[in-house]
């Protein structure tokens, strides 16, 4: 799955993101709007993880999407 597809179809994928990262609020998901850098930034804020770890978490999530 490439990120352009996620960005273009964010409404379809944000439910999956919410399931994976329950600490993301609905407002967070609206602000992210499918932008990877926004998602990673919000995840860093909500989970207190390092940037590299968040990037790996997002990569792992992408691998699970069909």
UniProtKB/Swiss-Prot annotation:
Source organism, top-level taxon: Bacteria
SUPFAM superfamilies: Hypothetical protein YjbJ
InterPro entries, per the entry: CsbD (IPR008462), UPF0337_stress_rsp (IPR050423), YjbJ (IPR026042), YjbJ_sf (IPR036629)
UniProt xrefs under Gene3D superfamilies: YjbJ (1.10.1470.10)
Disulfide topology: none
Record-stated family: Belongs to the UPF0337 (CsbD) family.
Protein's name according to its UniProt entry: UPF0337 protein bsl1473
